[in-house]
Amino acid sequence: MGLQNMTLRRFTLSMSALLLLCALLWLWAALEQQESSLAIRPVTPNTSMPDGFSIWHHLDANGIRFKSITPQDDALVIKFESSEQSAAAKEVLDRSLPHGYVIALQEDDAIAPQWLSRLRDAPHRLG
């Protein structure tokens, strides 16, 4: 009876530790994913932005997947799963878009600085 109780307790502790380890690995993997984005801006103010559909067509024709295409301020921002996808998209768009556009790679910030910037109202001033 005592041996069976101790074996059950060890099994329960082992399974709990394994479950905790799996949860930590899953959390770490989720935090490690880093998005990348590409911003397309016209060089001159009187140049219009490229159409999102034509951008989609060029990327799709070359097998490049993306998360979203959204206009943001004076740019068209394309979000990707990885920096490799955005680098490949930059090469494709450099070839296919007419001159007059700046295509810039942008690595998205890490999660911790994003949360910190959301939590604080204004930057702290020392001195």
From Swiss-Prot:
Keyword Lipoprotein in record: no
GO MF: protein kinase binding
UniProt subcellular location: Cell inner membrane
Gene Ontology CC, one term: plasma membrane
Periplasmic side: 32-127
Pfam families reported in the protein's UniProt record: SecD-TM1
TM spans (from-to): 11-31
Regions of this protein lying in the Cytoplasmic compartment: 1-10
NCBIfam families per UniProt: PRK10629.1
Stated family: Belongs to the MzrA family.
Descriptive protein name: Modulator protein MzrA
Organism: Enterobacter lignolyticus (strain SCF1)
Annotated gene: mzrA
